[in-house]
Amino acid sequence: MIGRIYGTGSYVPNRIVDNNELSKYVDTNDTWIRERTGIARRHVIEEETTSFMAVQAAKKALLQSEVKPEEIDLILVATSSSETIFPCTACIVQSEIGAVHAVGYDINAACTGFVLAFQTAQAYIDARIYKTALVIGADSMTNLVDWTDRSTCILFGDGAGAVLLRAEEGKPCLMAAHSDGTKANALTGMSRHHKAVTSLEDKITYVHMDGQAVFKFAVRKVPEIIEELLADASLGVEEIDYFILHQANKRIIEAVAKRLRLDLTKFPMNLEEYANTSGASIPILLDEMKRNQRFQRGDKVVLAGFGAGLSWAACMFEW
Ligand code: UT7
């Protein structure tokens, strides 16, 4: 069984902060940010919350799929920046959309979260436990970054994306995933009110990242996991139509394409507009591509996420 994508939706805040505006807050400039990351601007929450954005994206996915909220069995929200620790964001979404028969929970795996949530939903569907699943990625990273740290605050934006999956007979989704907790310190985030009592306090408050370590990890592990995933199905990378990677940095995506010896046109990007929206980046891009009718039935699509944990995951399905 496969969970076929029946509908997608996304939401980004109206407030746009471009690189020039950022240069008023920290010592940076548009040229540096564009050259090192490919980012030109980001959408930043004002009154919005993570759950508000998740609900808006979910409503659009529902509308597009023509599925009734009461038909949904499962709601998964990939987020590491929910405004409440509990209740989980998925239960807030359930209430707001009226998905009265669904069970909902959040998956916190930072930028890898959406791919892991998508895999979880696919596994439930393939096991015939649930038929209809709503998978959302939603994050308000600008709430967690230190706006005085130029090495991290320039990278992130806010948003949410959702996909509505329905069970159909078909080739199951291929999946691979890994974590390496020994490298956890390369990318950490604490809530704003966290009172750390260790000597590392200053370093681990807000988002703290060893940018180069994360960059090297991504460039090595993403091609590796894609090859691992496809080898299991005896597929070559050239048979894949689209590689939809977590939108962290244009140079990471270019390096992955180069390592796989593939044309960059197979690697759609929208990070210039939204920056790194963590768990939301892949579903926002999926929604944009679907609305622009970029997918044909039968297209082979790879999703790949990577980030804090450190963790990385990939999956492949036919559209
Ligand atoms: O979702 C997954 C999460 N994270 C990532 O994917 C991030 C992965 N890493 C990266 O994308 C890159 O490492 C960064 C974009 C964060 C940094 O790029 P880099 O090419 O690794 O730069 P760097 O850290 O080596 O810094 C080069 C220089 C330094 O100055 P010096 O020491 O050479 O004088 C930095 O202080 O650039 C300086 N710098 C900046 N300059 C202007 C660092 N941040 C900025 C800035 N504006 N915002």
Language model: regions and residue ranges:
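A contiguous, well-structured pocket-lining segment that forms one wall/lid of small-molecule binding clefts
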Residues: D202-L271
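Condensing-enzyme catalytic core mediating Claisen C-C bond formation in acyl metabolism
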Residues: M1-E47, D149-K216, R220, E224, ...
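Catalytic phosphate/nucleotide-handling subdomain of diverse soluble enzymes
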Residues: D287-A304, M316-W319
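Buried hydrophobic positions in well-ordered alpha/beta secondary-structure cores of metabolic enzymes
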Residues: I5-G7, I33, A61, I75, ...
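Acidic, glycine-rich active-site loops and adjacent beta-strand->loop/helix elements
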Residues: Y11, A78-E83, A109-T112, G137-T142, ...
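Conserved beta-ketoacyl condensing-enzyme motif
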Residues: I5-G7, E47-N108, L229-L230, L235-I253, ...
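Conserved catalytic cysteine-centered active-site region
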Residues: R34-R36, A40-F52, T79-A133, K258-L285
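Flexible, glycine-rich active-site loops centered on histidine and acidic residues
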Residues: D126-A160
